[in-house]
């Protein structure tokens, strides 16, 4: 018989659940909205350092902002009068879960649809204004978006106003099928009438502007300006590369690439847009 028993290789520890719960309660929690990660430089940024314009202090990347934030940055305080808020989609295809998706987007954004339309003053210059919000079903263009923008141009013709549109969209709204594609032609016809009346139309391309919006009113302005590094295109990069069987340049479909090739007139910093809009509208016979 051995004098000494063999020792275990490991020390058994019984977990103390009460200690674990006590420690977890004392760990501070950081609110999700306190910091933002820049998609460009990958730096973590304290939200307050972004400022109201939501521009990365490290690399100057322009974060996507809501229509309401854009409105605050652009127009004279208290001058905006919203129009055409009573237009509703007829949901022509009875697309599954479409109404639920619309309701969710309305609750998340505070908007009734993907575009905010109305009249406003920008440094004293009166104009008709539309701002698309990519947070609302990616600002896809359905019948309501098309109708609101068409009516805005009709109002601008009757009141002799310039039109300014901030574009941001993933394209036509698939839940409305061919009816969404019809909006491209309808809005373009209204733009033509506005142009024939000798009135000024300015488009401002923001990230992202793609699909049917790019193929219609986004690229039909008398002047086309864009925010830095905005994604602007029709089809997606992978679709194009697969179709043409070639690798595209790294900066393909960026605003700077489009300016270099003559599709955009100017790249303007977000913080300078208000001054630039007022200057261009006044230069083209604006209304004050």
From Swiss-Prot:
Catalytic reaction(s) noted: N(6)-carboxybiotinyl-L-lysyl-[protein] + acetyl-CoA = N(6)-biotinyl-L-lysyl-[protein] + malonyl-CoA
Primary site of residence: cytoplasm
Give the record's keywords alphabetically. ATP-binding, Cytoplasm, Fatty acid biosynthesis, Fatty acid metabolism, Lipid biosynthesis, Lipid metabolism, Metal-binding, Nucleotide-binding, Transferase, Zinc, Zinc-finger
Cross-referenced InterPro entries, in alphabetical order? AcCoA_carboxyl_beta, Acetyl_CoA_COase_Trfase_b_su, ClpP/crotonase-like_dom_sf, COA_CT_N
Which pathway does the record list? Lipid metabolism; malonyl-CoA biosynthesis; malonyl-CoA from acetyl-CoA: step 1/1
Is-annotated flag, keyword Nucleotide-binding?
A: yes
Superkingdom, according to UniProt?
Answer: Bacteria
Biological processes per GO annotation: fatty acid biosynthetic process; malonyl-CoA biosynthetic process
The prosthetic group or cofactor this protein requires is: Zn(2+)
Enumerate the GO terms in the molecular function aspect: acetyl-CoA carboxylase activity; ATP binding; carboxyl- or carbamoyltransferase activity; zinc ion binding
This entry's Enzyme Commission designation comes to: 2.1.3.15
Instruction: Please name every pair of cysteines joined by a disulfide bond in this record.
Output: none
Coiled-coil annotated spans: none
GO cellular component, as recorded: acetyl-CoA carboxylase complex
Subcellular localization, as worded in the UniProt entry = Cytoplasm
Q: What does this protein do?
A: Component of the acetyl coenzyme A carboxylase (ACC) complex. Biotin carboxylase (BC) catalyzes the carboxylation of biotin on its carrier protein (BCCP) and then the CO(2) group is transferred by the transcarboxylase to acetyl-CoA to form malonyl-CoA.
Q: Which family does it belong to?
A: Belongs to the AccD/PCCB family.
Know the name of this protein?
Answer: Acetyl-coenzyme A carboxylase carboxyl transferase subunit beta
Q: Which organism is it from?
A: Streptococcus equi subsp. equi (strain 4047)
